[in-house]
Swiss-Prot record:
Name this polypeptide is given: Capsid scaffolding protein
EC numbers, comma separated: 3.4.21.97
The protein's enzyme class: hydrolase
Phosphoprotein recorded as keyword: yes
Domain notes: Region of interaction between pPR and pAP is called Amino conserved domain (ACD). The region of interaction with major capsid protein is called carboxyl conserved domain (CCD).
Length: 534
């Protein structure tokens, strides 16, 4: 076991700025108290019960305050030797230097120096006690450039610092050589291993510790080879290492362990993100998807480059001007704007053993809803519900159709009667029906003022009874068709009520204002259920 080791390094560098005011030592004020030739305790991490040696002098040099000392505690040196025997870093080879496991472990464990002194504000006055209390070996000093170098020879230690001039080096070595290690008292090293281990664990969490040690070595200007780990890394092991369990080629850094539930959640989120959604269709001016053309319906032409153009309407068809005041674009049954269609379920994969596909739950829920709808239908049949009579003519069916749009020429807009002229409210423009002899007759306008209807108006040919007669128009003058105003002054409502037969009080009546259509109710319930499933 070594009788003693020398340590040397800067405890303050003048040219290096300080981040905290308490760390700044004014060279003009400190010079009055240097050099310090009396021995000061050398401790570990500023712990009072960890004295491991004594300082041999604090000297003022051009680069800062340089410290030299000796580690003479037998207990600490024995502990450091045991650590070096079991440390792989201590047995790593070093270029251009002999193998020294003890020096390697000290440079790895305690590579920094820290000076304990009074506060700089008290230096302006005459201090009542000593200015410097002790020097500590630590994992990283608070002042930059305070890095330690350990060695068996004091001259070798001081020669590692190129920032110390030859004259300053000679002055330091002259004083160190006059000190005998045998004359120094035995340090009081009684610190338990738990305290030292706790300090070592705390040092492992210092952020960018290795980079800061490299900076300290550069600030101290240590250019000669040394045992510092700030610039050299282990490249191999000189001893035979014990066998270890086999590991994958990917290494421990590439392998992580997470709970199964978290992995399944991440996988499901990734699958949901990969599902493509349907592109939104552009809003057209002619209705949600279809436009009327006589008695036929043609799809609208969406102006999207990815879609193939739709077939054109028949010859002679005139597109309706969407900006006319009476233009109405109905909503087709079963069409929902702004809703995404449910995509087909993937039955091939993305399921783990023991998992239940999501669409099974949807099927069970929809089956339950269908059963409820069937029970409601049976209840309606038991209550004796009967539908009203259907329309008796094509003109009347066109009049009550909420999805009808007329065929008209946008180049010659027609003038239709207003609400004040007939006393009723129009839902759509009047309907033009072509007679067999090539003439047009005007159908009766649709009115809201009939709460009870038992029989529809009787039609004669293609003209509705009660409608104002239309004068015949020659076939040659069909370029511009204009509406004929009614000749009589009575309202169409009165004509309908006059010609309609007297309703039978015993017949079934359908109150449109108090009872809704069961078909609409069922459709609404089914649509709401599908919306909730989206």
């Amino acid at each position: 076991m070594a009788q003693g080791l020398y340590v040397g390094g800067f405890v303050d560098v003048v040219s290096c700025p300080k981040l905290e005011q308490e760390l700044y030592l004014d060279p003009d004020q400190v010079t009055d108290y240097l050099p310090v030739t009396e021995p000061l305790p050398i401790t570990i991490e500023h712990l009072p019960e960890t004295e491991v040696g004594w300082t041999l002098g604090l000297f003022q040099v051009s680069h800062g305050i340089f410290c030299t000392g000796a580690i003479t505690s037998p207990a600490f040196l024995e502990l450091a030797s045991r650590l070096a025997d079991t440390s792989h870093v201590a047995r790593a080879p070093v270029k251009n230097l002999p193998k020294e496991p003890l020096l390697e472990i000290l440079h790895t464990w305690l590579p920094g120096l820290s000076l304990s002194s009074i506060h700089p504000r008290e230096l302006s006055q005459t201090p009542s006690g000593p200015v410097f209390q002790h020097v500590s070996l630590c994992a990283l000093g608070r002042r930059r450039g305070t890095v330690a170098v350990y060695g068996h020879d004091a001259e070798w230690v001081v020669s590692r610092f190129s920032s110390v001039s030859k004259s300053e080096r000679a002055h330091i070595l002259q004083h160190v050589s006059s000190c005998r290690l045998e004359d120094l008292s035995t340090p009081n090293f009684v610190s338990p291993l738990e305290t030292l281990m706790a300090k070592a664990i705390d040092a492992s969490f210092i952020r960018d510790r290795l980079d800061l040690l490299k900076t300290d070595r550069g600030v101290a200007s240590i250019l000669s080879p040394a045992y510092l780990k700030a610039s050299q890394f282990p490249v191999g092991i000189q001893a035979v290492t014990p066998p270890r369990p086999a590991m994958n080629s990917s290494g421990q850094e590439d392998i992580i362990s997470i709970p199964k539930s978290a992995f399944l959640s991440m996988l499901q989120s990734s699958i949901d993100g990969m599902k493509t959604t349907a592109a939104k269709m552009s809003h057209t001016l002619s209705g949600p998807g279809l436009m009327g053309c006589g008695g036929q319906m043609f799809p609208t032409d969406h102006h999207l480059p990815s879609y193939v153009s739709n077939p054109a309407p028949p010859y002679g068809y005139a597109y309706k001007n969407p900006y006319d005041p009476w233009y109405y674009s109905p909503q087709l049954p079963g069409y929902r704007t702004g809703k995404r269609k449910r995509g087909a379920e993937d039955d091939e994969g993305h399921l783990f053993p023991g998992e239940e596909p999501a669409y099974h739950k949807d099927i069970l829920s929809m089956s339950k809803n269908i059963a409820e709808i069937q029970s409601e239908l049976k209840e309606m049949k038991l209550n004796g519900w009967h539908a009203g009579p259907p329309p008796s003519s094509s003109a009347a069916a066109a009049a009550v159709d909420p999805h009808y749009r007329p065929h008209a020429n946008s180049a010659a807009p027609c003038q239709f009667p207003t609400m004040k002229e007939h006393g009723g409210t129009y839902v759509h423009p009047p309907i033009y029906v072509q007679a067999p002899h090539g003439q047009f007759q005007q159908a009766a306008p649709i009115l809201f003022a009939q709460p009870h209807v038992s029989h529809p108006p009787v039609s004669t040919g293609l003209a509705v009874v009660g409608a104002p007669p239309a004068e015949p128009t020659p076939a040659s003058s069909t370029q511009s068709i204009q509406q004929q105003a009614p000749e009589t002054t009575h309202t169409p409502c009165a004509a309908v009520e006059k010609d309609a037969p007297t309703p039978n009080p015993t017949s079934n009546r359908v109150e449109a204002s108090s009872r809704s259509s069961p078909k609409s109710k069922i459709r609404k319930m089914f649509c709401e259920e599908l919306l909730n499933k989206q």
